[in-house]
Structures are given as C-alpha cells and as structure tokens.
C-alpha cells in the first residue's frame, strides 16, 4: 500500500529547488552531523529515546515538544517512509510537487539537509487547498 507524506524541505521549503534538481528529500535533523544508518530503529519511541538527550545538549533552549517534533520528522524521513511511498512538498510558488521515494536513507556530509532519501520527482503538481478541504484528489499531470 502506498502512503503519502507532506514534507517541508527547510523553512518554507527553501531547499526544494536543490532537492528537486538532486532527486532527493532530506532533513537537517537538529545539527546531528553524522551518518545515523546504524542507529535507525524500527519504532519512533526507541529512536526518540536515543536522540533526545543529544538534541537537548545541542539545543538547550528548545522545548522537549519542539525537539520531539524534530526527532519525529527525522525518523519519518530516514526510516518510516518506504520505497514507493509518495511525498508532497510545497515548491515555493503555491503548488505542491509530488515525488516517489526510490531508495533507502543516505547521508551527505556538509550538505544542506544531509539526512536524505532518493526521490523521483513526478510530472505532477497539486494546488494548495485550505486545510479543511485538503485531499490528494486534486493532483493532475
């Protein structure tokens, strides 16, 4: 079964052009600048327990809720999204772009959004709808 995920590629999807050109989605993951391949757990709770202390050290002024959300997004990008799932991402021009995840997590040292998944961006856009009316039925080729 294909799952759909709405993602942001940086604040206001500022990194979308780079991600689109490079064929990937990614997460900055709170300044954790190392490959976490060997630390990806099957469940979010274990992942969060592993990384929350490190996140609190890196960002002592952030709330546990904010750090938990950060961990949740990183885990979703790095582990939870499956090959074949679709991602919907704002492109900065008022539309959503659609991509299909094509491979596993990889890390790019020194890159923007270094925690990445390969994506094949599809030739589809979706108009932004008010939240209460949102659906995936408005995608068109």
Language-model-detected regions and their locations in the chain:
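Compositionally biased, charged N-terminal/linker segments
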Residues: 1-73
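Short, well-ordered loop/turn sites that connect or cap secondary structure elements
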Residues: 80-82
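Short beta-strand-centered aromatic/proline hotspots
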Residues: 94-107
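Short, solvent-exposed secondary-structure boundary/capping segments
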Residues: 105-120
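Glycine- and charge-enriched low-complexity intrinsically disordered segments
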Residues: 119-141
